[in-house]
A protein has these predicted regions:
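Basic nucleic-acid-binding interfaces
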Residues: 1-2, 8-100
Length: 100
């Protein structure tokens, strides 16, 4: 699942809302793929649906937040035209789960 967002940060209140949203999606297991684009694996559609419900409860009042669910195969087929995979992506690799 990909979470992409563009949130205003002009006022102190908007900055707090941005930081809180970012912190909350990271608590949901999302890792930063690139600036304002976060990714997380979902082994089943029912899990994606429950994550979507939780994300809907924490979105700030202003801005733009989008979610999209894609398969692992589609994610693996993503082409990187410039740059490289993030450190978090390298650590995760193609594994669905990280055992700590």
């Amino acid at each position: 699942m990909l979470c992409m967002f563009d949130l205003p940060v002009e006022t102190g209140e908007e900055q707090r809302a941005y930081r809180q949203f970012r912190k909350n999606i990271m608590k949901e297991g999302f890792i930063m793929m690139q600036y304002s684009v976060y990714v997380r694996t979902c082994p089943r559609r029912v899990i994606c649906a429950s994550i979507e419900k939780r994300i809907k409860r924490i979105v700030p009042a202003k801005g733009n937040v989008r979610l999209i669910s894609i398969t692992e195969k589609q994610y693996q087929d993503m082409k990187i035209l410039v740059g490289s995979r993030s450190l978090q992506e390298e650590c995760l690799g193609t594994e669905r789960m990280i055992v700590i």
